């Protein structure tokens, strides 16, 4: 983990074959989105504690259907059961809600993320039109509706 030019990064060693060849950008070797999706689903299935993985999956629902995400997982990990990620996406008890989350220009609400993950499981072939996030109030591009969440709801679920 670290930053390059103010962008947070994770450096990983991965022993599975890539679904698509990595590409170079700004001198960095980057995995293809299909590989990243498969690895995120594996992390959720195996551990399920990283809040960011769940947020990333909800955000990726604007580019990929859950069905296509699961096909990436099956291709990358052919001997794994696809039910693990499906169940993992809906099991929230192990998530570390103390993890700091920074999404430029957006505020996240766990309730919106959880709702999107549930919607993804119910509409597995659907690609969603909008991200499950609200724009920061300072951003001018889009008017944000009144926000009635408490600070505790913004940074984790109610206990």
Task: Name every feature range the model reports, one short phrase each.
Residues 1-158:
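Compositionally biased terminal segments of proteins
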